[in-house]
Amino acid sequence: MPDATGVIARNPFEEAPSRLNQYTPEEAAALQARLEKKLGPEYISSRPGAAGLKVHYLAADKCINLANEVFGFNGWSSSIQNIQIDFVDESPNTGKVSLGLSVIVRVTLKDGAYHEDLGYGHIENCKGKAAAFEKAKKEATTDALKRALRNFGNVLGNCIYDKDYISKVSKLKTVPSKLDVGDLHRHPDFAPIKKEPMRVKPSLEDDDLPPNPSIAGRNTSTNSAADMDAEFGSDVFDEADFNVGEGEYPDGIVAEDTQKRHQPPTPVGRPNAHLNLPKHALGAQASGNQHVVTPSKPERPMNLAPAGRQIPNQALNNRPFPPPAQNQYTNQRQSVPLPGSNGGLQNGRSIPLGQRASNGMATGSDAGAQVPIKQEHGAKQPNPAPQNTAVPATPGINGQGPPVVGFLSARGADMLRENPHSAATVAPAFNPHAESPSIRKTAGVDHTKSIPISKPMLAGSASPLSNQTRDFINPSAEMHRKIGAPSGSVVGGPMNRGPSVSSYRPLTRPNVDPKAAAQNNTAAANRMAPNMNGKRPPLNDVTNETLPGGNGCTPAPGLNDPKRAKYDESMSAQQHQQQHQH
């Protein structure tokens, strides 16, 4: 009915028309294929049940995540249709509550299809009614939701009721998942700060370098044909070189032999000539040309290096090159060509294309703009046919001769590093036969030769004594150990330390004259015994008692004392005292 403003308001008691989004046949088929798959062992949980058996189930959180994954977060919904309380009992003595209830939940998809099922929850002997109803209703709702979702297919839990499947999948082992901190939703105040990668600042010597061929190759798609020719020079990347049509991919086509094709003439006004590049060189340039030699990047010892092309002055960031006498390349790295080294091969190896002088090479100022490539020193080669241009020999770094290459000692290497040119004649050479005094060597073995070691060679040398035990002995456990003295049983002590090999000398017997030995034996036999019994006299006891008539402690005379008066037992005690007085 219209209101005061004349606008007809909708009846709030009427149900709103449902907006259904029907699945297309393709979506329905894809959804059906997902629902028919069975779950992996990582989704299935188990708990102990009756009679010692395990009860397998699908946790509620995993079930909801599976529904969102299959249907989408906005592709399904759930609603509680009915809650029925079955019983509520309260104990009159303890006041504890026991109840049970059932809940019916409906799960509806976005196209209107739905399933509903029953869930049950209960609690026994709860202290309060509120806690009892909360626990029972949540349990029943969760149970009803899982049972309603399993009606859609195996992937939502229906496969758990297959005993044959459970018996097989429960034997599979799962690897615990690792927590990825980057996937966590963090609060902005506690989120880790992402550090930007450090940008390498280009050095001053790289300001006038030619552009990277890989970067320049990517920019050619947006440039015109004239700009491409001006930047790369001539028709280096022409279709004739690749032998590829307009609709073909050049990386999958094998280029024909470059020696059988005739090189196109050099157009007038273009600074560079056409270079015949081999197949591997073309592939290297297409993939980034990582072997380009620049003043800041030394060359690599490869048999075939990329071609050193000449780059026009107008293409180098619109900055002309300085004259050849002030060229930066000649100040940092100059090639050292040898006489007659313009051939195609050197000692059976191919020379990089940048070292050859072709018929179409430019001369004069263009030669100074070319990126030179260092050439190896090899044997003399036959002089090839005369070329149109000749590359003059250039000195080494800073106008000096090339550094001397050889084997030097460690001290010589340090001297050569500080002054590579003047120290080459003064630095000591490496001596492979030098003997170091700090290295111990086995006695009796010739270390200057490589020969097998036999047992007679080692007969004169003794191996160091090995330790008697490796177990640690507590020094306090020795009862007769002197305070401050090292223990005799400690591993590595001076008592157990074996003699070194270098200082060991075998024991030798002294040369004894047999006549002198016989005289010594005769003199020892005629020597008188120390006492009448021919034995060592026994030790006497010492006392500190004061004898009568004496001033101090006088030790009692021993039995074998020569100053003691000898008497017979039959003598009277009177005579014995008189002898002592005398």
UniProtKB/Swiss-Prot annotation:
Q: Which Pfam families does the record cross-reference, listed alphabetically?
A: Rad52_Rad22
Any GO CC annotation of this UniProt entry: nucleus
In this chain, composition skew of type Low complexity spans: 516-529
Q: Could you confirm whether the keyword Nucleus appears in this record?
A: yes
An example of a GO molecular function for this protein is: DNA binding
Q: Where is this region: Disordered?
A: 194-226, 310-400, 485-582
The primary location reported for this protein is nucleus
**Which compartments is it annotated to reside in?**
Nucleus
> Keywords assigned by UniProt?
DNA damage, DNA recombination, DNA repair, DNA-binding, Nucleus
Which residue numbers delimit the DNA-binding region? 146-150
| Basic and acidic residues biased stretches | 194-204
User: What spans are recorded as compositionally biased (Polar residues)?
Assistant: 326-335
- Ubl conjugation in keyword set: no
Tell me the GO BP annotations in alphabetical order: DNA recombinase assembly; double-strand break repair via homologous recombination; double-strand break repair via single-strand annealing; mitotic recombination
Q: Which domain of life is it from?
A: Eukaryota
What job does this protein perform?
Involved in DNA double-strand break (DSB) repair and recombination. Promotes the annealing of complementary single-stranded DNA and by stimulation of the RAD51 recombinase.
Query: Quaternary arrangement and interactors, per the entry?
Result: Part of a complex that includes RAD51, RAD52 and RAD59.
Recorded family membership: Belongs to the RAD52 family.
- Matches recorded under PANTHER family: DNA REPAIR AND RECOMBINATION PROTEIN RAD52, RAD59, DNA REPAIR PROTEIN RAD52 HOMOLOG
Name the UniProt record assigns to this protein = DNA repair and recombination protein radC
Q: Which gene encodes it?
A: radC
